[in-house]
Regions:
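Core structural elements
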Residues: 167-172, 221-227, 231-233, 340-341, ...
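Amphipathic alpha-helical blocks
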Residues: 171, 185, 197-223
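Conserved polymerase palm-domain catalytic core
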Residues: 208-209, 213-228, 232, 266-435, ...
Length: 567
């Protein structure tokens, strides 16, 4: 049966824009702190594990069974309230979501499957966000739709014929395009993508050789190159980053093209990181909506070294719930267990470290696997708890919002759930907050109850946090400093515009007007002083370098000072 004629139980995110989050209603009851006081063929397995019939995935799909809204993995369709702990089989960022403001948000818009930094744009009508999806050809998009529809209509179907899709020339070509666009540092072999990007003949030969390696199953992942990045401006904490080779990044991107549509059908609606048509603004919409509904007690959870602690065996079990293709499973296992190579700065000697747990931060497929491992938690909290809390998650950063008095019990059960899956809460950062008394910070925003000046109604006030504002100012200072005065002013202002546009794109939401005005004033004054000293002027700091001159002659970007609630 043609994939276009398949009828599904729910509209497809790949065709009908499913998943676009609606904005919470503007007209709300007066709710506030005061009022709230009172090729291996194991067989296609469908449903309960019975043998299913063969499905050709590269152009057609089987007619799905009865439509089902149950998208949980490995759990009963009739979810029961949990008692002592959350039910469900629970097994299985590139950086933490607290660094979202550092993400690149300006650049050429694209489609695709694997997502580093979702900040802008709602995406295309077929459900793939411009920033979150690898730009794919029509035939590859058709494959993705087939996979998504099959997974959506049959929540317990296991896909057993996927490996052959990985070495299709169109899939590998799309994957290579993504790697070229993202650029990035070389892996342990020192090979970069510049040659492939400039020489079509070399590109075609390289892709053909890679496809042959995959087809003959002689491809083996290389070790990842371990580097360290500073997590803060003070340079007190470092994050280990594993950089795969270009070949490994291309194959991982191809795997993401094939696997993302399958798991996208299972992911919970309250998970927003590294997904099509999802972004931080929608996560904040859900937080605000929960607060307005009376869920003012919040478990502000922080996972300790999440990406480094994910156990391989449990994660592979989670993958196997949807994928029974042994070749794909072995490939994912090889990526997870690839050793890391670290070069000693003093001696220059290389040290090889085995990887017994965790998914390498820097791998293309790592965000997808990290989302998968916490998917059961999303469903357990939002659907299987009798208290009916709301959990909003962005990668390893999440909030559990509940009614007053329920937070302590939920935090205990959360701790027990995570320990059973060999994960840890950061006890120093995890806290239980009554938002009627103090605010919270989430995804770079601060949220606190405030009373309107005119309406006198209490509302959740959302604006960029002080930490996010400080990060922006530090970045602007790093560009407008004494060492850059010998550079052309237009080029320096262009760098400033890239920083401010990206930051504003991430935080142009909620009640950000006042903060945006302050940040614009800071950037203008900083640029004025830089220009004044560059040209050695003795007067006219403000009278000569006016706002109009900065915007007209030097092309300084003007901030948007009207921050409407965004969908």
């Amino acid at each position: 049966m043609s994939s276009e004629s398949t009828t599904t139980g729910e509209p497809s995110r790949f065709t009908d824009g499913e998943g676009c989050q609606d904005r919470p209603g503007q007209s709300r009851k007066d709710i506030g702190p005061k009022s709230l006081m009172s090729d291996q063929r194991t067989g296609g397995v469908s449903g309960g594990g019975g043998s299913g019939r063969v499905v050709r995935l590269s152009g057609e799909t089987c007619p799905g069974g009865s439509p089902s809204g149950d998208s949980t993995i490995g759990t009963s369709s009739a979810a029961k309230p949990c008692k002592a702990g959350w039910a469900g089989a629970g097994v299985g960022d590139l950086h933490s979501s607290v660094d979202l403001a550092d993400s690149k948000t300006v650049g050429e818009r694209r489609e695709g499957t694997c997502p580093p930094a979702p900040q802008r744009g709602e995406g295309l009508d077929d459900g793939r966000s411009d920033e979150l999806w690898i730009k794919t050809s029509p035939k590859v998009r058709k494959l993705q739709r087939v996979l998504y529809r099959k997974a959506k209509t049959e929540p317990h179907w296991r896909f057993y014929s996927l490996y052959g899709e990985l070495y299709r020339q169109d899939v590998l070509s799309d994957a290579l395009d993504q790697v070229i666009e993202n650029a990035g540092a070389p892996g342990v072999d020192g090979f970069t993508v510049e040659t492939l990007a400039k020489d079509p003949t070399a590109r075609a030969a390289w892709l053909h050789a890679l496809a042959e390696e995959l087809r003959t199953k002689t491809y083996r992942p290389s070790p990842v190159r371990r580097v360290y990045l500073w997590k803060d401006q003070a340079k007190t904490k470092r994050r280990a980053l594993g950089i795969p080779t270009v070949k490994d990044r291309v194959v991982q991107s191809a795997a993401a093209i094939v696997l993302q549509p399958i798991w996208e059908a299972d992911f919970h609606d309250h998970s927003y990181a590294y997904r099509p048509k999802r972004r931080t603004h929608q996560a904040m919409d859900k937080v605000r909506e929960a607060l307005l509904s009376g869920k003012v007690e919040v478990v502000d959870a922080d996972l300790s070294s999440y990406f480094d602690l994910i156990p391989h065996r449990q994660l592979l079990r989670q993958v196997a719930k949807r994928v029974s293709d042994g070749s794909v499973l072995r490939l994912i296992k090889a990526w997870l267990r690839a050793p890391s190579v670290e070069e000693d700065r003093d001696t220059g000697r290389r040290q090889v470290h085995p990887n017994r747990c965790g998914t390498p931060q820097g791998g293309v497929i790592s965000p997808l696997l990290a989302n998968l491992y916490l998917n059961d938690l999303d469903h357990a909290v939002n659907e299987q708890c009798e208290q009916k809390p709301t959990m909003v998650r962005y990668a390893d950063d999440f909030l559990i919002l509940c009614k007053p008095g329920q937070g302590a019990g939920l935090q205990t059960r959360l701790q027990r759930w995570l320990e059973a899956r060999k994960l840890k809460l950061n006890e120093a950062k995890t806290r239980l907050v009554d938002t009627r008394k103090e605010g919270i910070e989430f995804l770079g925003f601060s949220v606190a109850w405030r009373q309107g000046l005119k309406s006198q109604r209490w509302y959740p006030h959302v604006e960029p946090s002080a930490k996010s504002q400080a990060k922006l100012r530090d970045k602007v200072r790093a560009v407008l400093e004494v060492r850059t005065r010998n550079q052309a002013a237009v080029a320096v202002v262009r760098k400033v515009n890239q920083i401010t546009r990206g930051w504003a794109g991430a935080f142009h939401y909620g009640n950000s007007t006042h903060v945006f005005g302050q940040q614009q004033t800071f950037v203008r004054n900083r640029l004025r002083r830089w220009l004044w000293r560059k040209y050695s002027r003795t007067h006219g700091l403000f009278s000569f370098f006016t706002d109009d001159r900065l915007a007209g002659q030097y092309k300084l970007w003007n901030w948007p000072l009207t921050a409407a609630w965004q969908r």
